[in-house]
From Swiss-Prot:
The lineage of its organism: Eukaryota, Metazoa, Chordata, Craniata, Vertebrata. Residues 20-63, 203-226 are annotated as: Disordered. The keyword Nucleus applies. This is Ventral anterior homeobox 1a. The gene is vax1-a. Residues 204-222 have a biased composition (Polar residues). It comes from Xenopus laevis (African clawed frog). It comes from the Eukaryota. May play a role in the specification and maintenance of basal forebrain identity.
Length: 295
């Protein structure tokens, strides 16, 4: 009994599988389509929109219709020559003309300059009255004062630099004038501005014995040596830089060495030996002086 039932179940399963795998006839397909709704038949399998695209299109249409400043797409050509589409942000209008620069009349500039000299910051009611008198907006007056303050700061920086250069030049000229008049006897000598004279006691080793003998003080003026005249620019007087504007003063002083000869001989040998130019003067004149003394 159990075996017969099993055979019957297997036979039924085979028949059901055959009915499922058997294709339907055209008549059955037409009957099935007649029962389906018409909306389902209109949609084809390859024409489904991308997910979210319908919502985006609807949003774009509604926003573009309600907002005149809606973003727009334009085609641009990049550096490689390819054309691509970019989206301009909302509120950016390339067709809008640029704001023209405000041009002030001579009368307006004169009044603004006078007010700036009186007070550099005009705010509140004063700015309102001034803008009404000059037929300008408060923003234009405000921007003009801001630009004027910036310009004044730049001018003050340039004036301070020029003032420092002028003060250094005046101090150097006063020192040189005192040197020329003989009133200043203590500062170190300037090889570029004084005649090539040598003052001091020089010692040379004695070749005949281990001791040393002192040589006479040399007060004569040796011949002109080009190495003793370095350029006056760049040297220091009391740690003050000498600018290049003193070229005329140096030429005037060097053209009259006789007026400075007596004063320069009175300068102490201690300052001359401790001068900042000592390595230059001693290294150059030592060999020539030794040769003269040995002769």
């Amino acid at each position: 009994m159990f075996e017969k039932t099993t055979d019957m179940d297997i036979r039924c399963n085979i028949e059901e599988n055959g009915r499922i795998s058997k294709p339907k006839d055209n008549k059955e397909i037409r009957e099935t389509q007649a029962k389906m709704p018409s909306t389902y038949l209109k949609e084809q399998p390859g024409t489904y929109p991308a997910p979210g695209s319908s919502e985006l299109c609807a949003k774009n249409k509604s926003s573009s219709a309600g907002d005149p400043e809606y973003c727009r797409r334009i085609l641009v050509r990049d550096a490689k020559g390819s054309i691509r589409e970019i989206i301009l942000p909302k509120g950016l209008d390339l067709d809008r003309p640029k704001r023209s620069r405000t041009s002030f009349t001579a009368e307006q500039l004169y009044r603004l300059e006078m007010e700036f000299q009186r007070c550099q910051y005009v705010v509140g009611r004063e700015r309102t009255d001034l803008s009404r008198q000059l037929n300008l907006s408060e923003t234009q007056v405000k921007v003009w004062f801001q630009n004027r303050r910036t310009k004044q700061k730049k001018d003050q920086g340039k004036d301070s630099e020029l003032r420092s250069v002028v003060s250094e030049t005046a101090a150097t000229c006063s020192v040189l004038r005192l040197l020329e008049q003989g009133r200043l006897l203590s500062p170190p000598g300037l090889p570029g501005l004084m005649p090539p004279c040598t003052t001091g006691t020089l010692r040379a080793p004695n070749s005949s014995g281990p001791g040393t003998r002192s040589l006479a003080t040399v007060t004569s003026t040796p011949p002109h040596q080009p190495g003793l005249h370095p350029s006056p620019t760049g040297h220091n007087i009391f740690n003050m830089p000498v600018p290049s504007l003193l070229g005329t003063v140096a030429n005037r002083l060097s053209s009259h060495p006789l007026t400075m000869a007596g004063n320069l001989h009175e300068l102490s040998a201690r300052y001359l030996s401790s001068s900042a130019f000592e390595p230059y003067s001693r290294s150059i004149s030592k060999d020539s002086l030794d040769k003269k003394l040995l002769d």
